Structure formats: structure tokens, C-alpha cells
């Protein structure tokens, strides 16, 4: 039996309502949904899954939540969000990993964020500002390396067919 749960931070109704220790006692595995750090209901733009946030929450699972590492499966995203700022409001749309490049205009500069372990792109179009924290093989590698660092049970992915062609070779390299 596996049970998927969100990160142990944030909303009392969304993520703080789970007793992960008890779930860990009765389930064979807990799948930590290591994504939606900034989701559809977020009031501000941000990454889907910064490596620093993922690691901090793995530590919470192991520490304050009391879940054994051998029971934790790290869920990782094969998607990101494009955030749109327009007249002071922020909205987002989900973009599959394999479609990210086609959603960023040619010539847009990307910059590496070393704490998030992600590239970031920002551009203007039609009077709106677009921001994207890029999920790709490089950003996913950092998250998968945490599986090894903390001796977790393994990794899971949301969701198949959203990934780029280079992902599975990297997954095999990191986790085998």
C-alpha cells in the first residue's frame, strides 16, 4: 500500500492535516509529492519544485514527521508552470516538460538559480510579463540525487508522457 501526501508545510487543510508518522506505520510507502511548491492557487509566482524546498521537506519527513527513509518515495514533476503577471494579478498555466522550450520565445535569456537548481526565464509579450522556472533533466537530477543522499525507497513521476526524451537515461544513471 502506498499513500501520496503533500509536503509538510503550508495550509492546515491541504498539507498540515496528515499524520505522516501514522501513515508511515500502516503504509508500505509514502509518496512525497515533491511538487506544487507554488501551485495553481499560489498568490505569487514561483517554482514548481525547487531542490532546496524538496530537500527541506525530505528532512521534515525524516525528522519531525518520523517517517523511515526506506518508506519514502520522492514524487517529482514532469511539468512546470508559466506565470503571467498582468496589471498586478498573477495567473499560471501548466506546461509539460517536453513543451517548455516551445513556450519560451527565441532569444529569451535563461539564468541558473543555484539554490533552486533550476534555470529561470522571464520575458515580456503583449504588455504582460511571463516567468518560468524550468523543469528539465538538470533540475530533475538534483531532486533524484536526494533519493540517494537520504537513502529513500525510490522515485515516482508526475506524470508519464510529459517528460523530454533525455529524462530516462538520466534517471537510470542517477538511481542505478
Language model features with spans:
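Substrate-binding surface in catalytic domains of secreted glycosidases
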Residues: 1-105
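A generic secondary-structure signal marking the coil-to-beta-strand transition
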Residues: 70-72, 130, 151
Amino acid at each position: 500500500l502506498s499513500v501520496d501526501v503533500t509536503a509538510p508545510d503550508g495550509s492546515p487543510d491541504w498539507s498540515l492535516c496528515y499524520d505522516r508518522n501514522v501513515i508511515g506505520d500502516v503504509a508500505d510507502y509514502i509518496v512525497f509529492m515533491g511538487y506544487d511548491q507554488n501551485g495553481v492557487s499560489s498568490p505569487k509566482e514561483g517554482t514548481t519544485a525547487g531542490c532546496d524546498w524538496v530537500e527541506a521537506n525530505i528532512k521534515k519527513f525524516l525528522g519531525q514527521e518520523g517517517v523511515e527513509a526506506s518508506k519514502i518515495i520522492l514524487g517529482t514533476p514532469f511539468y512546470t508552470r508559466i506565470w503571467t503577471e498582468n496589471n498586478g494579478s498573477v495567473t499560471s498555466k501548466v506546461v509539460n516538460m517536453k513543451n517548455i522550450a516551445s513556450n519560451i520565445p527565441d532569444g529569451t535569456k535563461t539564468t541558473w538559480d543555484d539554490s533552486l537548481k533550476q534555470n529561470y526565464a522571464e520575458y515580456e509579450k503583449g504588455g504582460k510579463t511571463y516567468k518560468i522556472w524550468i523543469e528539465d533533466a538538470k533540475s530533475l537530477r538534483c531532486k533524484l540525487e536526494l533519493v540517494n543522499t537520504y537513502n529513500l525507497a525510490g522515485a515516482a513521476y508526475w506524470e508519464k508522457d510529459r517528460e523530454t526524451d533525455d529524462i530516462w537515461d538520466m534517471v537510470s544513471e542517477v538511481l542505478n
